[in-house]
């Protein structure tokens, strides 16, 4: 499953992390692997440093369908303020771009 999602062993790791009460961080994995984690996990996940792919199409950012899955999972996505992950074409990060990211992310608020 290299670059294509979780292997069977990867699914077992997620299940073991759930049993141990560990958070599963979906940052730095492919979108397919994110989807697999969200399918397998029994606990909320975290994306400790990720941004919206729709705003800045970087491979480490999270596509909208996964943002929706994280919301359903009651997980947390924390914005990565590295400019290449927030602003298209790696221009220097400015307050307006960060505000755009924040406003976009408000589409996916906590379920409560």
Question: Language-model features: where?
Answer:
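Extended, charged catalytic domains and RNA/DNA-binding interfaces, predominantly
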Residues: 1-91, 95-112
